[in-house]
Amino acid sequence: MLSHSAMVKQRKQQASAITKEIHGHDVDGMDLGKKVSIPRDIMIEELSHFSNRGARLFKMRQRRSDKYTFENFQYESRAQINHNIAMQNGRVDGSNLEGGSQQGPSTPPNTPDPRSPPNPENIAPGYSGPLKEIPPERFNTTAVPKYYRSPWEQAIGSDPELLEALYPKLFKPEGKAELRDYRSFNRVATPFGGFEKASKMVKFKVPDFELLLLTDPRFLAFANPLSGRRCFNRAPKGWVSENIPVVITTEPTEDATVPESDDL
């Protein structure tokens, strides 16, 4: 059984064969129209028009990249030519100096003579020597560096009001004003007869209580209240009656003989 792709291909071949039979040889010259444009072709076609702002920018960038590529190529070719010329000159100089004495390595220009004493101006331009005006720092002392102070801080430092506004301080507690001695008219509950007779009328008696010893059973009952509770657990009992006692004899029972009759 053919697959789906094979069946589709076979149907296309059959359709093309039928059209060839109908139209004959004119099929090859038939105008099928314009090919369907893919997104890439559409974008390139839009970039080729100068009416679009994006297309103009694209052309400018393309020209700039081409210019950079050509300039870079010229620079590389020029550098290669200079390198080849230098190599040829070196070979010529080497061939001329084969019989002569070898020269030492050439020193770059503006190099100070090592035999002369070093000049601070040559070593570090602008350096005139060690600072002699400032005394050396003493041992175990810290030099306070000068810090930058903005004009705003200088203006605030001269005005105490601005300084207090910038660095607020906590409010100090104000002194309490002395209260005036007012007479109180609040009513107080007074006992009958006045406060003088209240001590005689009101009497309090301490209640009597009895101290229990540790060995007292009442104290033990209070200490362990579960000890005096009634137990409802059932104890196992035998198959005996509670009212009638059962007498068990150990004497052996005698076999009662049955008298035989005369007929037997």
UniProtKB/Swiss-Prot annotation:
InterPro entries: MYOZ. It is found in: Cytoplasm, Myofibril, Sarcomere, Z line. The modification Omega-N-methylarginine is found at residue 53. The modification Phosphothreonine is found at residues 107, 111. Coiled coil: none annotated. The keyword Cytoplasm applies. GO terms for biological process: negative regulation of calcineurin-NFAT signaling cascade; negative regulation of transcription by RNA polymerase II; sarcomere organization; skeletal muscle fiber adaptation; skeletal muscle tissue development. GO terms for molecular function: actin binding; telethonin binding. Disulfide bonds: none annotated. Residues 90-135 are annotated as: Disordered. One of its GO terms (cellular component) is actin cytoskeleton. The modification Phosphoserine is found at residues 101, 116. Its main location: cytoplasm. Pfam families: Calsarcin. Expressed specifically in heart and skeletal muscle. In skeletal muscle, localized to the soleus and plantaris muscles, which are predominantly composed of slow-twitch fibers. Residues 106-120 have a biased composition (Pro residues). Keywords: Cytoplasm, Methylation, Phosphoprotein. Myozenins may serve as intracellular binding proteins involved in linking Z line proteins such as alpha-actinin, gamma-filamin, TCAP/telethonin, LDB3/ZASP and localizing calcineurin signaling to the sarcomere. Plays an important role in the modulation of calcineurin signaling. May play a role in myofibrillogenesis. Belongs to the myozenin family. Interacts via its C-terminus with spectrin repeats 3 and 4 of ACTN2. Interacts with ACTN1, LDB3, MYOT and PPP3CA. This is Myozenin-2. It comes from Mus musculus (Mouse). The gene is Myoz2.
